[in-house]
Amino acid sequence: MPNLAEHYQLSEQDYLAGEPDSPIKHEYIDGEVYAMAGASANHNLITGNIHGELRTHLKGKPCRPFASDMKVKIGSRYFYPDVLVDCAEYAGDDQFTETPTLIVEVLSKSTRRMDETVKRSSYSQIDSLQEYLLIEQDIVDVELVRRSNGWRSEHFFMGDQFTLESVGLTLSVSEIYDRVKNADVTDWLLQQAAQAEADAAASMTAATHAAATDQP
């Protein structure tokens, strides 16, 4: 996630030359270099959950999933999406891709504005991009925008499922938020536990009633 308070000017050539050896990742936006801030536990869990599902689903297929360390080049801009999938023939460049099919960003208070404005506008200019997935980490809210839907937003919440048409993968929101800790996840887990307890009690009552009915 870019730290907007820590940025400076640099040529595109110098940025590309220095980035591989830098201990801190940087995004590059029209001549300005922005240092990437560290990510929270929830951010890392969500990124890992999404990447894990994609990696399993795409194993043995042409499309390749990447997490966090592969840059996307759009004109004179370079971003590090949290997760991306590239289905184009591998060109051998290990620094960036220009042909992502799917991009995923995990949002936070410090990155939401960038992810929903600058990055959304930039990503929509990528001819190969079919879907952009934005995932909140502090609440449960999954936003999916598709090229085929005119980049209009669809939102999904706990209990919902949706399909990433670009890669043919159906995900549940609960899979995305597995082991994530926020108030929405906690409330949903409590509701699920209460429902399971109620169902078990109802089953026991039904079984007891059936046994009593069967007695002569």
Identify the meaning behind each predicted range:
Residues 1-216:
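Gly/Pro/Ser/Thr-rich low-complexity, intrinsically disordered segments predominantly at protein N-termini
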